[in-house]
Amino acid sequence: MTSMASLFSFTSPAVKRLLGWKQGDEEEKWAEKAVDALVKKLKKKKGAMEELEKALSSPGQPSKCVTIPRSLDGRLQVSHRKGLPHVIYCRVWRWPDLQSHHELKPLDICEFPFGSKQKEVCINPYHYKRVESPVLPPVLVPRHNEFNPQHSLLVQFRNLSHNEPHMPQNATFPDSFHQPNSTPFPLSPNSPYPPSPASSTYPNSPASSGPGSPFQLPADTPPPAYMPPDDQMGQDNSQPMDTSNNMIPQIMPSISSRDVQPVAYEEPKHWCSIVYYELNNRVGEAFHASSTSVLVDGFTDPANNKSRFCLGLLSNVNRNSTIENTRRHIGKGVHLYYVGGEVYAECLSDSSIFVQSRNCNFHHGFHPTTVCKIPSSCSLKIFNNQEFAQLLAQSVNHGFEAVYELTKMCTIRMSFVKGWGAEYHRQDVTSTPCWIEIHLHGPLQWLDKVLTQMGSPLNPISSVS
């Protein structure tokens, strides 16, 4: 029996040849099985093996798509592990540290990119590029308080706060979402994206903006340049900021480089910290994330992995039976990715997670306090640095209070298993058994530097309106 098994355990010459281009030295057996599974598929297609070898041996040269059939859920299983095929083979042959499909974008020459939802999917690793973090332009803070107090957004923000419902509204992903750039995974074919309910609109968001709104942003265009060219600085006839559709009103007066102090964004050592709560009690120490890929799960991890925050390790003498039962259902929890200046949350738990992110709500045109339900196996973009940068650059021209208000965008709340809001009997996140609060250090530190540069508020921050 052993001799029979050994006859079939050898590595074929084609697999050995392809493994010669493998990157990294980890998970040899897994990579071998992944390549072996691919070879079996490609041998059925004339010229596919040759095209793949050509792409791997000559990275700088043009190559054709190398495709395999798309599975029902879009994923491929290799040795008890499921993953997206283009991610698997980009990891084998280009980037061994690749974590997620959010880190990849197809090149224009690719005819069968993963995101196109065709019957075939291209796995040519040189038909994809890795997403790079965008360079955020510095915010130009006036050296003197030259903005008109009448232009302050404080009144608008106070009115918005007063109009916030006692209970947050709710939205379910993807049913309540209409932005196609945040697709659920896996996505069923021809999935409809109904418009979000008008009653849950975030005032002046990309999805709902009034004329002349300082927060009027195009939803899917890159941020405008904030630094005027040197030859235009100080001229009286300075032009509005260049945008793709001229939707953003001119909010920067004519200024010279001597009148403003640029405040640049700096990437911190830890991109976020995560604090765990049970009801209204904080449990354990804060977790500081240095890895761009973080798992928050309900298990224990004796190895003390720096990319895992294991809630199963944390004890609480005040824990009741509801909390105990909820903790048992957290399971694999949530996977947080920080990629290309964007934060994604992927629900790995069998139960849904519930997210309150003002940045995400702003993008989708929801009310600021809306709680979004993310079902199992779905992922959602919950923060976008570039949109935040636009808001910050514009808020500077409307006073200290408008900038200070953006601190609320830098904190994201997320509950496991149990939701809260208008559609649930729990009205507040502190009524849910198990939840976390995520603090985004980069945006918070940027805000702090801008506020320091701006000096004192025109109207002192107060709990009394």
Swiss-Prot record:
Secretion signal, residue range per the UniProt entry: none
InterPro entries per record: Dwarfin, MAD_homology1_Dwarfin-type, MAD_homology_MH1, SMAD-like_dom_sf, SMAD_dom_Dwarfin-type, SMAD_FHA_dom_sf, SMAD_MH1_sf
Compositional bias of kind Polar residues: 169-182, 234-243
GO molecular function, one term: I-SMAD binding
Keyword Ion transport: no
Location of this chain's protein in the cell: Cytoplasm; Nucleus; Mitochondrion
Comp. bias intervals (Pro residues): 186-197
Keywords linked to the UniProt accession: Acetylation, Cytoplasm, DNA-binding, Metal-binding, Mitochondrion, Nucleus, Phosphoprotein, Transcription, Transcription regulation, Zinc
GO cellular component, one term: heteromeric SMAD protein complex
Main location: cytoplasm
Record's keyword annotation contains Transmembrane: no
Post-translational modification: Phosphorylated on serine by BMP (bone morphogenetic proteins) type 1 receptor kinase.
TM region(s), chain numbering: none
Residue numbers bearing the N-acetylthreonine modification: T2
Domain MH2: 271-465
Residues the record lists as binding Zn(2+): C65, C110, C122, H127
A Pfam cross-reference name: MH2
GO annotation terms (biological process): anatomical structure morphogenesis; BMP signaling pathway; bone development; cardiac muscle contraction; cartilage development; cell differentiation; embryonic pattern specification; erythrocyte differentiation
Family statement drawn from the similarity comment of this UniProt entry: Belongs to the dwarfin/SMAD family.
Subunit structure: Homodimer. Forms trimers with the co-SMAD SMAD4. Interacts with PEBP2-alpha subunit and SMURF1. Interacts with SUV39H1 and SUV39H2. Interacts (via MH2 domain) with LEMD3. Interacts with WWP1. Interacts with TMEM119. Interacts with ZNF8. Interacts with RANBP3L. Interacts with HK1. Interacts with HGS; this interaction attenuates BMP signaling.
Protein name per UniProt: Mothers against decapentaplegic homolog 5
Organism: Rattus norvegicus (Rat)
